[in-house]
């Protein structure tokens, strides 16, 4: 949001602009209206103040009973997990995380899962720009919706397709947009359930893919502050999740060692509280 002029005085117009930004970036409400360090950090770097508290995370670790207890004891109730591949969730894991919700009241905190698609084991790794061809987009879109259906994710579930690569602007236009166009086509052709296409990636990628109409929701890879796609670009208007810092619990030698990425939540999409296989 812009203001009409800068006077050097923190007047009501400036305070309003600051508050609107803080609300948009989902900064803690107690900071609203104050141009403090947390606010400046969010303006100056993509990851912002990494000490800020959130209730969402993503992880490549299987959420066992022990890990679930660790995460919830530390305030994490929303989990990003992979649909397929080496780090995929299982039906048993989904039931472990979401099953207890059925016995909770309306005002009780419920666990949620948001699904991520990133292929592992491909001849070309999915963190290289060469991976993203139109044909791969068709294959990935089909595989993702079929996996989501098999797990029982309902209509309206957002699936976040990862492009974990620092694509330059011309690469977004020439390579990633055709890939995501074909992912969207695969979504539109799937009749069993209607899922919503989202993407994971740097800010510039998220902005362009959503502006093209291929995705409706973004999971922003803001931890990568040095990515060209995060330098000088605003937080996308369609952001749902914002990955901004790592965290870990326990020693790496412990069987229940848990490492996560902290994820801010905009409120436009919260994840899924139940599945119906």
Region locations from a protein language model:
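Functionally critical loop-and-helix segments that line ligand-binding/catalytic clefts
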Residues: 52-59, 209-277
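Structural recognition of the beta-strand scaffold that forms the well-ordered cores
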Residues: 54-58, 77-82, 112-117, 157-162, ...
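Catalytic domains of carbohydrate-active enzymes, especially glycoside hydrolases
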Residues: 52-87
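Short acidic, glycine/serine/threonine-rich helix-capping segments at coil-helix boundaries
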Residues: 1-42
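Active-site cleft segment of glycoside hydrolase catalytic domains centered on the general acid/base Glu
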Residues: 165-190
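Substrate-binding cleft of extracellular glycoside hydrolase catalytic domains
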Residues: 85-167
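Aromatic-lined carbohydrate-recognition surfaces of secreted/lumenal glycan-active proteins
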Residues: 190-208, 216
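Acidic, Ser/Thr/Pro/Gly-enriched interdomain connector segments
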Residues: 1-8, 48-62
């Amino acid at each position: 949001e812009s203001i009409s002029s800068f006077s050097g005085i923190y007047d009501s117009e400036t305070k309003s602009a600051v508050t609107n930004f803080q609300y948009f970036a989902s900064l803690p409400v107690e900071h609203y209206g104050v141009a403090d360090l947390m606010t400046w950090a969010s303006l100056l770097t993509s990851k912002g103040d990494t000490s800020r508290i959130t209730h969402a995370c993503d992880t490549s670790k299987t959420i066992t009973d022990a890990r679930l207890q660790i995460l919830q004891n530390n305030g994490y109730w929303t989990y990003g997990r992979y649909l397929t591949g080496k780090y995929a969730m299982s039906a048993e894991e989904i039931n472990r995380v979401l099953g207890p919700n059925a016995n909770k009241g309306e005002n009780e905190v419920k666990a949620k899962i948001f699904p991520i698609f990133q292929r592992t084991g491909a001849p070309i790794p999915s963190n290289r720009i060469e991976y993203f061809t139109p044909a791969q987009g068709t294959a990935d879109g089909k595989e993702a919706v079929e996996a989501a259906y098999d797990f029982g994710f309902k209509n309206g579930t957002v699936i976040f397709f990862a492009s974990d690569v620092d694509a330059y602007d011309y690469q977004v236009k020439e390579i990633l947009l055709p890939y995501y166009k074909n992912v969207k086509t695969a979504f539109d052709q799937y009749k069993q359930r209607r899922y919503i296409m989202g993407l994971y990636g740097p800010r510039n990628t998220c902005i362009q893919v959503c502006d093209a109409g291929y995705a409706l929701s973004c999971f922003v890879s803001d931890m990568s502050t040095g990515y060209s796609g995060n330098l000088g670009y605003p937080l996308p208007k369609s952001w749902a999740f914002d990955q901004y810092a790592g965290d870990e619990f326990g020693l790496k030698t412990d069987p229940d060692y848990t490492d996560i990425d902290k994820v801010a939540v905009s409120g436009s999409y919260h994840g899924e509280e139940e599945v119906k296989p």
